Amino acid sequence: MFNASDRVQVLSEALPYIQSFAGRTVVVKYGGAAMKDSTLKATVIRDVVFMACVGLRPVLVHGGGPEINLWLEKLGIEPQFMKGLRVTDAPTMDVVEMVLVGRVNKELVSLINQAGGSAVGVCGKDGKLLTARPQGESGIGFVGEVASVNPQLIHNLLDGGHIPIVSSVATDEEGQVYNINADTVAGELAAALDAEKLILLTDTPGILQDYKDATSLIHKLDIRQARELIAAEVVAGGMIPKVTCCIRSLAQGIQAAHIIDGRAPHALLLEIFTDSGIGTMITA
């Protein structure tokens, strides 16, 4: 248990990071175990509110896979995945939109407001924030990718002292609704906002050299090394869209992308405000 001296030391270590990142935008992709465990959820909410209180400009992009699967099961629809992406036919798309926009997003808004923040929930449709296009791969249905980002709505919310909570549902130019991978949305939004950092909360310690060995964490790598890991299939499955979105956002100018373990309490604060950090950092 921390004593008073330990707490002072922690705050002292955090001070230069607070000073350095004041006024900077940090995009956080929130998903996985940190959404399912109520204790972890509470720490993430507190971390985001803390970030806002000390002068950072957090933007939270959320998934909702477990909640979507729960409602698909209730409605007798079998969840299917292909290459880490949810196969989304028309009935599944209806459930995805209902769950992400109507349930998960508004719950997060409520929790952040209760914790002392001022959250506003939006999806890609709002303010023409995101325009979607088909992902293009056969057999995955209404799975989209980001065609364009109009970040003005998010800028307005941040300038007004709010914490934007973004769900990854958007429409194309004709109004067709698409489910976009939340990691992808977080990466494209981070680039459009010229964010200081992109942070992805996952269910692993980060990028592992051997996915069976939690101690084989790769602490730091650059874009070239990340691409080599994908080609060598060290990065596979659901980690592919995570690493790919980091690469894309770095190529568009953000300073650093982090893949961290959302199962660790206060993982966000450990990454941003400590010397050692946590997880894997990817740089240009």
UniProtKB/Swiss-Prot annotation:
Sites marked Transition state stabilizer = 29, 242
Query: EC number(s) of the enzyme?
Result: 2.7.2.8
The parts of the chain that form a coiled coil are: none
The protein depicted here goes by the name Acetylglutamate kinase
Q: Which SUPFAM superfamilies does the record match to this protein?
A: Carbamate kinase-like
Per the UniProt record, the lineage of the source organism begins with: Bacteria, Bacillati, Cyanobacteriota, Cyanophyceae, Acaryochloridales
- PANTHER family per record: N-ACETYLGLUTAMATE SYNTHASE (PTHR23342), N-ACETYLGLUTAMATE SYNTHASE, MITOCHONDRIAL (PTHR23342:SF0)
Q: Which residues are recorded as binding substrate? A: 64-65, 86, 179
